[in-house]
Structures are given as C-alpha cells and as structure tokens.
Amino acid sequence: MSYPGYPPTGYPPFPGYPPAGQESSFPPSGQYPYPSGFPPMGGGAYPQVPSSGYPGAGGYPAPGGYPAPGGYPGAPQPGGAPSYPGVPPGQGFGVPPGGAGFSGYPQPPSQSYGGGPAQVPLPGGFPGGQMPSQYPGGQPTYPSQINTESFPSYPVFSPVSLDYSSEPAAMTQGTQGTIRPAANFDAMRDAEILRKAMKGFGTDEQAIVDVVANRSNDQRQKIKAAFKTSYGKDLIKDLKSELSGNMEELILALFMPPTYYDAWTLRKAMQGAGTQERVLIEILCTRTNQEIREIVRCYQSEFGRDLEKDIRSDTSGHFERLLVSMCQGNRDENQSVNHQMAQEDAQRLYQAGEGRLGTDESCFNMILATRSFPQLRATMEAYSRMANRDLLSSVSREFSGYVESGLKTILQCALNRPAFFAERLYYAMKGAGTDDSTLVRIVVTRSEIDLVQIKQMFAQMYQKTLGTMIAGDTSGDYRRPLLAIVGQ
C-alpha cells in the first residue's frame, strides 16, 4: 500500500524580521519585504497582544464544553457527527475559552533559546515477535490531582479506520486555497476604494469586504503600502477606527502576514493569566518545519521573547515536552516510507502503552514528534494490524488532558489534515454560541492553503456545507467577509 505524502504547504517565509526590542507590534519600516515601487509600512498599527485571550464574541454566550467521548471504538454514538468519511461517528475537538479584548502589549527584554529535547531511548520489541494475548492493566487511572475545571470535557476525534481508499484527492493531488491572487490587480485603485469606504460619515463595509476578501495576502500588503503612499495615513489604524468586534478581528487578521499572525496568536494564547492550550496545539502541531522556524524567529524579533521559554513557563509535564519538541521544527519531512521502521515503531508504541502497566510517554513523544506524516500513517496501519486497535484509541486510553489532545492532533493531521480543521470549525459553531476566534483563525490561516479541501471534508463529514453553517451562526457585516472567503 502506498502512502502519499503531504506536499509542502503553508505560509511563505518572511526572511527579514526586525531586531528584538522593536517598539511596534507590527513589522516596522524596512523589515518585511514590501513590493518595489511602494515605501515600506510604518509600525504601530496592528492591535497589540491583549492581556489575555481573544476579543469577546460580541454578545454570544461563551461556548460550553462538549460531552466526553464514551468508551472505545465500536458502534457509532447516537447523535454524534461523523469523524472521517466511512468511519464511526466522532465527537470532535474542543474549543478554547474566550477572553478579554485588545489592550497594550509589553516589550520585555529579549531572551536566549533553551536547549532542545534530549534523545529518548526506545524500548525493545516483543520477545520472539509474539504479541501479548491480553492488554495488561486495562483502562489507566488518571492522576487525581487533575483539575476538571482546567480540563473540561472536550469532545475528541473518534478513532478512525485506516482504510486509505476514502482519503480525499487532496492527499495525492495537492491542496488549494479559496483565495487566489486577483487578476488585473491595482494596489492604488484598491487603496482608493478603501479610502472612499471610510471617508465621511459611516463606513461602507461592503466595499471593504469586496476588496479585502478577494485579494491574496501579498496583494493586501501592497494595498497597505499604496494607501500610505497616496494618503499619508496608515490603513490599519483607519480600519481599526471604523470597524469593531468580530468584523475588526477578521479584517485585521487578513492584513497580517501569515507568519506574524501565527506568532501574534501564540503570544496572545500565553499572555496574562491562563493559557489557551488548544490554540498552542492547533498551531504548533499542524505547521510545517519551515513555518514553525519562521514563527519562532518572528516571535523573538517582534515580542523580544523566546517561544520555547514561554511554553516552558506556561505549560508543564508531558504536554510541555511535546510542545517544546514541536517548536524545534525538526520533523522528518521525507515523503518516502520505511515499512520496517513502521513495524518497529508500532511495536515500540504498543510496548510503551497497551503492552505494559503504566505508560512510557517519552516513547510516544519521540516517535510522534520526529516521524514524517507518511511514516506515521504507515505506523498507524502497522499498529492496527498488530494490536487489533487503532493508535488513536490507544492514545485515548493511555493519556488524558492536553497531552492527549496534542498527540491525537499529530495523528489526525498525518491521516487527513483537512478533516482535522473541518472538525475544529464544526465544533467552533456547534451548539449555543460561537467560538469566533477559532472560526476566524482557521478561515484566515487556511484560506490560501487548503480551505477548498476543508470545505469538501466538512460537507462529507457533516452533510452540510461550511458556508451554510457559517451563515446560520453569524450575522451582518461579520458574516459577509467570512462567506466571501470560504467561497459562498
């Protein structure tokens, strides 16, 4: 069986970040590569990282927790939404809590990087190559000190069948975003349209949407430069003065360079009291090596802080070690598959979990943090044949809390990354209230990468289109740009 690899995807690098200690919260003049013919943008325009969380959801009630997954894989759960096509229904991925609005952003002194994770010895295989006849220990008992208020009952993916015949075309034919560079693009003309939309009394939000939601991120950077050249004003400051709430968050996110947006989001997730762990998981466990390395550099230069040290100070235990491994950006990205290694890794993972009392967490961390996604898919198939239980189910049995969510996110992305984001979007809108920050973040960050495939998986998994669910869960000026981006 072949295991098609993921083509390199993601955000284009931004090679020239400003030095540490820069005052502005957005790239200052002369640092990011702006197009020739336009002067570089000034700093200080983007909203600075708040003391905690994302902007409020504009009156929506805070999203509540979802019921915990029940039992092990088997019959579909009644009422649940399907996980991947052709497999039992799952319950999905939780959403981070909301937070306060925008506020000032401190500029602390720069910090140096810490050391990377140490090499972890792997346990050996089974004696004589034979599998244990029973699973010793049964269901693990989780530590009693875990605070259930800190670990709400978020839904998680149901384990999936390893039938790769149901994989979408995106797995073998590349992925596509819904936003493409506009033809006959004229930055000066677009700048003039935006100026007229914000001039005088009132704001023409539709004109803003027509421009912003139909230009690529690179074209938006050119529009910003053209706006300052033509009018001597900062476009971002003008937009902030004219917009508010979720509409403001969405439009400003679209104008941030992708690497900066990820770094800015990570800083917000760890700023102030509390940590948005699921935001850390969503970014660090799904990005490519190049994207992660660019995020680390941008985080240091923009905020004068070391990402790894912030992770260490805001997380702990095996979850901390997993995220530190992720922020190294050292996953093997070779698209070929070593089937012998896959078999050996499957045995090691079994012996580190189901095949012993307790769990060797370091073995799971090492394999899931270093192997390529095609290699992990082969390992998952070998594990399923060997253990008569899929690896996602075993992770659920052996781990709990955010480390479980992080490990499962890696495996879910190895199987089908668009399906992972489709489920995140579904549970951001399911039930009372909307997790608008998750909705905005995924729609914006995937709009030029794989939002086409995410839409396809969403419709296949939930029997409704992404646009239909967005239209029913949002309203007004905020709804229009979201629908324009997803292609409704």
From Swiss-Prot:
Start and end residues of each stretch annotated as Disordered: 1-49, 71-150
Gene Ontology molecular function, alphabetical? calcium ion binding; calcium-dependent phospholipid binding; phosphatidylserine binding
Q: Where does the record place Pro residues bias?
A: 1-18
Question: Is Acetylation one of the keywords?
Answer: yes
What note about domains is in the entry? A pair of annexin repeats may form one binding site for calcium and phospholipid.
Q: What does this protein do?
A: Calcium/phospholipid-binding protein which promotes membrane fusion and is involved in exocytosis.
Family (UniProt): Belongs to the annexin family.
Its protein name is Annexin A7
Q: State the organism's lineage.
A: Eukaryota, Metazoa, Chordata, Craniata, Vertebrata
